[in-house]
Amino acid sequence: MIKNSPFIAFIIYCLPILCIAQPKYEYWDADKKQVKSEDNYKRGIAHGKTASYFKDGKIARLGWYKYGKQDSTWKFFYENGNPKAIEHYDFGVKKGHNLYYYNSGKAAQETVFKNDRPDSIWTSYFESGMPRSIESFNYGKRQGVWKYYYENGKPQSDGLFENDKKNGQLVNYYPNGNVQSQENYCNNAPCGKWAEFYDNGKVKIEKEYKDSIEYLINLWNEENKQVIVNGNGNLTLVSDKGKLRGKGTYQNGLRNGVWMFYYEDGALEYTTTYINGKINGPYNAYFQDGTLKSSGKYIESKKDSLWGFYRSNGGIEMQGTFKNNLREGQWTYYFESGKKESEGYFADDKQNGTWKYWYKTGELWKQGVFANDIKNGLWTTFWENGKKLQEGNYVNNKEEGGWQAWWQNNQLKDKGSFKDGIMIGPWQGFYSNSKPNYSGEYKNGKKNGKWQYWFEKTGKPREITNYVVGFKHGEFIQYTENGFVDNKGKYRKGKQTSTWQYYYETGGMQRQQHFKNGHLSGKSILWQLNQKMQCQMNYTVIKDNRKGHEQSVPNGTWIFYDKNGSETNRVSYKRGVRVQ
């Protein structure tokens, strides 16, 4: 909060007049004992010193703004007083050497920025002081040798970047210093020969990348038994917990034949067939209890032909055809009950042609036409009894032209027009007994002009409202069902204005009030059912600075009367406060 100060208050209130003033704001804690932060402004924009403080008064942040942008040196601190970071800015742009520290005060990282982009050598450290990483940048892009270390000082990995892409050899190490893997990259893509090793230094895998395809050449298990020789052999995949996760055959460095994969508990997860490293042929996946989960066929590692997907209870969930991994042709989706949920056609994985949707009970819900995933053409929605609910055309996923809606008894409910998804022109509504409900016009999706509403049973007027582009504006009147006026008045841009009158159901006056911009203002009168005066009131409108809006409050003399209309009491107010 801002501490109460005559000097500060003077600056704040004079700011609109003294445009060249440069006020200083101090924000204090709840007890007003300690400054939490301070900021300087020029012409309403942060300019000059800025600072924040811990509860004990020690500084947490110290910096400078220049016309709303960070500038010069910024310093950040831990609660113990040790530095946390030192950063440099030039009119909002980070630059130069920047330093970061651990809570202990030891260096954590040194960075360099050039025009707000990483540049030159970045170095980070463990809290012990040992190097953690050495990274090289050139104007925001990784460039040159990158090295990472374990806290014991031994290397973790090192590699080369060229123009932000991995190029050349990347080596990873175990904490004991032995090589974990040797990788080669060409423009960020794996290429050439790769090797993996066990932590005892013995070779685990030798493989090679050709045209982005991985070829497994040799593989040794933990007992140092070679199971893949020159790209051929049977391989068993085991989890870190020693559980069987998969098994199959390699030929000429690529997976071939039937492969089987398992859940951690040993249950079969899925089976598939490989030809020269690509999935070709039948594919079947299972839930852990052995229930079929999905079934289909692959060609060149892409889903193809008819596929079925099933629920854990054995019921079908969806079924359709793939072509080159994309949905093609007719697809059908099902509820858990097994009844159809929706059905239609895909072309290149996009909905096309007529689609139908059903209620869970089995009755048709809606149907319409898609063109490349976009609604186009006639769409019809139905009640569960089969009668039409609504109908109209879409163009590019938006309602267009005349639309109609019906009640379940087939009586017209609504009718009107759309343009580009927006309601336009005359609209009419009807009750299920075919009597009129409403009538009016839309302009660019907003009510405009005179709108009329009627009661359902009697057909008598219920309300007459005038609109200007969505706002109630002009004469307004509401009626009771027996034909008497209930209330009437005027609106201006959606807010009550001028004199409003309210009536008893018998037709007698109940109250008369005056409004200004939606708020009670001026004289209001209340009448009793016998039409004797009950109360005379006066209001004025004030601005509530705390809430940032206007409100009506009692003002002037209020006069009260008994059931016979004789005065019983008077009370005076001044801007919401009762005056003795």
Question: Residue spans of the language-model regions?
Answer:
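Bacterial Sec-dependent N-terminal signal peptides
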Residues: 1-24
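Glycine/tyrosine- and acidic-biased, solvent-exposed loop/turn segments at the edges of beta-strands
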Residues: 19-580
